[in-house]
């Protein structure tokens, strides 16, 4: 499992990396997409963090998980174990280093508020 272990000084490119990745993944969610959020340490201006872009995707429901997972695979993502009912997880590693983590939650899931409070 590839993980980033180093904490890096804040990088002003992190919000831009979120925006670029957000555009890449949005089409894979179609009509079920409600919204996306840059979450985690890289979303906090000025905060040192592991350089992994965390994205929360809120959906109305998990309509076609197989098609979505295939789309995400074409972007270099691997679907991990569901973190709970209604909370799917994808990760992207480049050259053995974790670069992105995507949490896909059904609207109303308790983890949404927790992740947005960070």
What role is predicted for each listed range?
Residues 110-118:
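Catalytic cores of NTP-dependent nucleotidyl/adenyl transfer enzymes across multiple folds
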Residues 67-75:
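Short amphipathic alpha-helices in soluble, non-transmembrane regions
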Residues 75-110:
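Conserved catalytic core of two-metal-ion nucleotidyltransferases
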């Amino acid at each position: 499992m590839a993980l980033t272990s180093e904490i890096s000084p804040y990088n002003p490119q992190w919000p831009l990396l979120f925006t670029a990745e957000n555009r890449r993944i949005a089409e894979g969610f179609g009509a079920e997409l409600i919204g996306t959020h840059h979450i985690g340490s890289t979303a906090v201006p000025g905060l040192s963090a592991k350089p992994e872009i965390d994205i929360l995707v809120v959906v109305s429901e998990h309509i076609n998980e197989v098609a979505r997972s295939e789309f995400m695979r074409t972007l270099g993502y691997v679907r991990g174990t569901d973190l709970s009912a209604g909370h799917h997880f994808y990760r992207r590693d480049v050259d053995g280093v974790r670069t992105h983590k995507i949490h896909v939650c059904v609207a109303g899931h308790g983890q949404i508020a927790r992740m947005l409070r960070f």
